[in-house]
Amino acid sequence: MIRTMMNAKIHRARVTESNLNYVGSITIDSDILEAVDILPNEKVAIVNNNNGARFETYVIAGERGSGKICLNGAASRLVEVGDVVIIMTYAQLNEEEIKHHAPKVAVMNEDNVIIEMIHEKENTIVL
């Protein structure tokens, strides 16, 4: 059986920009992407902690060290600059792969700097 499991999470990032006139997507600082192994053009699910919106888009790599989290195109209507978001990817794994799978989680501070990396296992609580 194949199951869809969380693969990576950027936890509590702050939206730094919103660009309605760009052709869709989310731009994320390349350093953050590398830390959690998210690739450009990869599909992501986004949860806005401020308003409860949940949506999907794809990733564009942003400038390294910028802390940039910019929602582009239609998705920009679902956020405000300063909103706290969770950005996740999923992977389809078989039962054997699941036994050895540990999602990468980057916990962010208010400036979108990684303050903790968690290789998530069962029952991990991230506040």
Swiss-Prot record:
Keywords tagged on the record: Autocatalytic cleavage, Cytoplasm, Decarboxylase, Lyase, Pantothenate biosynthesis, Pyruvate, Schiff base, Zymogen
Cofactors named for this entry: pyruvate
UniProt gene name: panD
Sites of Pyruvic acid (Ser) modification: S25
Pathway note: Cofactor biosynthesis; (R)-pantothenate biosynthesis; beta-alanine from L-aspartate: step 1/1
Active site: S25 (schiff-base intermediate with substrate), Y58 (proton donor)
Gene3D superfamilies recorded: 2.40.40.20
Top EC group: lyase
Cofactor binding note: Binds 1 pyruvoyl group covalently per subunit.
Substrates-to-products reaction catalysed: L-aspartate + H(+) = beta-alanine + CO2
Similarity remark: Belongs to the PanD family.
Any GO MF annotation of the entry: aspartate 1-decarboxylase activity
Cellular compartments annotated: Cytoplasm
Role according to the record: Catalyzes the pyruvoyl-dependent decarboxylation of aspartate to produce beta-alanine.
The record's account of how the chain is modified after translation: Is synthesized initially as an inactive proenzyme, which is activated by self-cleavage at a specific serine bond to produce a beta-subunit with a hydroxyl group at its C-terminus and an alpha-subunit with a pyruvoyl group at its N-terminus.
Protein name: Aspartate 1-decarboxylase
A biological process from GO: alanine biosynthetic process
Pfam families referenced in this protein's UniProt entry, alphabetically: Asp_decarbox
The protein's assembly and partners: Heterooctamer of four alpha and four beta subunits.
Sites where the protein binds substrate: T57, G73, A74, A75
One cellular component term from this protein's GO annotations in UniProt: cytosol
Protein EC: 4.1.1.11
